[in-house]
Amino acid sequence: MAVVDISEELKSLSSTMGSIEAVLDLDALRADIAALEEQAAAPSLWDDPEAAQKITSKLSHLQAEVRKAETLRGRIDDLEVLFELAADEGDADAQAEAEAELESVRKALDEMEVRTLLSGEYDAREALVTIRAEAGGVDAADFAEKLQRMYLRWAEQHNYKTEVYETAYAEEAGIKSTTFAVQVPYAYGTLSVEQGTHRLVRISPFDNQGRRQTSFAGVEVLPVVEQTDHIEIDESELRVDVYRSSGPGGQGVNTTDSAVRLTHLPTGIVVSCQNERSQIQNKASAMNVLQAKLLERRRQEEQAKMNALKGDGGNSWGNQMRSYVLHPYQMVKDLRTEFEMGNPEAVFNGEIDGFVEAGIRWRKQSEK
């Protein structure tokens, strides 16, 4: 790469980083960190474990964000020195090393730029993810379980905390549905682009004749409700059912009636939780899910009114958005962004950052 090209490239990278720093408002983030550190140092912090967990989690996330931005700025500043040294020494290996670092910085900058696109009203929230097996019988149930594993592995790779609230196992294999939380800031803004119907095409391992089977699973992503949302639920409007938790094949995993199912009578919304140790904990988790669903219902009603005013029919969350083809060829393709990967196994193992980043950019472009 010519010296002039390198100089212009480095100026462009520095300018892009400057724009990202302005959007992130690092000074404001540092002030937030200082305030949270003060709260975290309070002797009474763990008097309320749930509040303490939120404070420490948010503090850790903000510290990581600032550290990531500062590190990337340092790498960009160091690039000029790397290329100058390579040129002065006339060393091909040093030049190759500098160019590899340049490519790595480009990629890191692209990833950080995506974070600045998460500016929606609820984007900074934690996320509640629900996956349901749809058409396709046992293959759909197996597919739903693959998607659950995919998202949990993705979260694990990013060191994001997750909590599975409920999993309804299918009789033969897989799951009927599952609900879990991704407990990190901006989880909702990030994962909401995964909402929709996912399609799997493969030779069914459950078909004795080895025929190709198409199956579907639905992914719903909701923001976790906070006190400022004012989602109040009257206990008189709830029907509470308790039952024993069950595992794969209907096998009981608890000897007491600790699982809880809540039915919101005015709307007919039903949620359940069985993964906590006690009935009280399961009810609290189920209430969190119910609040999120009621918030989403309110948002959809408000959006419907806006769409009616604009003459826009809107998009249903059930629209097909991604295909996972394992036969006759191997390809995972997002039908909205055209982003694709030829390694479905890697995708099912949690390597979905490319799809998520492309989805966030596509959504931002669609809003213009």
Curated annotation (Swiss-Prot):
Locations listed in the record: Cytoplasm
Listed Pfam families: PCRF, RF-1
PTM comment: Methylated by PrmC. Methylation increases the termination efficiency of RF2.
Domain of life: Bacteria
Disulfide pairings: none
A GO cellular-component term linked to this record: cytoplasm
GO molecular function, one term: translation release factor activity, codon specific
This protein's UniProt keywords: Cytoplasm, Methylation, Protein biosynthesis
Modification N5-methylglutamine occurs at: Q251
PANTHER family listed in its UniProt record: CLASS I PEPTIDE CHAIN RELEASE FACTOR (PTHR43116:SF3), PEPTIDE CHAIN RELEASE FACTOR 2 (PTHR43116)
Function: Peptide chain release factor 2 directs the termination of translation in response to the peptide chain termination codons UGA and UAA.
Descriptive protein name: Peptide chain release factor 2
Organism, as annotated: Streptomyces griseus subsp. griseus (strain JCM 4626 / CBS 651.72 / NBRC 13350 / KCC S-0626 / ISP 5235)
